[in-house]
């Protein structure tokens, strides 16, 4: 919606560097300090988003908010987080399932018409663990996790 454009863009920008790109900064860090900086920023922003979603359904808008591009941009990263990023990219301070509001957000997104059908969890996991041989030398694809959004 045009009246929310600035708020939507600001939310997308706030999430991109520390969350959407932050998981990759963590996973492909070449130094301990680069990793520490990326993980710290990532979880600081996840903590902020958890607080923001208290009593709300969506990231932007009045009251409970309304579904916008900001939600759609954040969803893939959160949906893949416990399945891939916690282990593969060492983003393991907490899982999304440990954040009740973020977990509920992911579940709400998955329950939207047409979303669940596009989430091919095994493919997502296989792609990440197979394609980044430099950080997963033997291309082992883990069996877990056994709980989370991917089990819905």
Q: What is the meaning of each model-derived region?
A:
Residues 1-152:
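C-terminal alpha-helical interaction module
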